[in-house]
Design a protein with these regions (language model features):
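Membrane-proximal alpha-helical anchors
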Residues: 1-70
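An amphipathic alpha-helical interaction surface
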Residues: 64-134
Length: 134
């Protein structure tokens, strides 16, 4: 085996190791991006509830949807935002690590279960959210 053969073997091994390292870095970056994407969406929900505190009881306290048309429209808009967020998280739960997966599922199920506004909105627009029912 000549020196060029040895050099070629070293180059192949280096390329394989580099590919493995790049894959691992890419995978970590994808996980971090997914996690921070979920946190960003939840932060937007928090901002919405801070800006419109009158909507929060419809999602966390089981308050039924009633009131004037303006209030109803606002609650429906927030319900759409909440369901969009939930579907995004639900669709990516396999990327979120298993330790956090139970927490995400519990949060989604508990919020959905305690919110007539979400249930009503989802019943009207279920085809928009196919990922949530999987």
């Amino acid at each position: 085996m000549g020196s060029s053969d040895v050099l070629a073997m070293v180059a192949i091994v280096a390329a394989i190791l580099s590919a493995i390292y790049s894959y691992r870095l890419s995978r970590r970056a994808h996980h971090a991006s997914t996690y921070y994407g979920a946190i960003g969406l939840l932060r937007e929900l928090d901002k919405t509830f801070i800006e419109y505190p009158d909507t929060r009881p419809y999602f966390y306290d089981g308050k039924p949807v009633d009131g004037d048309e303006s209030s109803r429209q606002r609650v429906q808009a927030v319900a759409e935002l909440v369901l969009d967020t939930f579907e995004w998280i639900w669709h990516r739960q396999d990327v979120l690590n298993a330790k956090n997966e139970v927490g995400w599922q519990t949060y989604i199920v508990d919020t959905f279960s305690s919110s007539p506004a979400l249930q009503e909105y989802y019943a009207s627009y279920a085809p928009w959210y196919p990922g949530i029912t999987k």
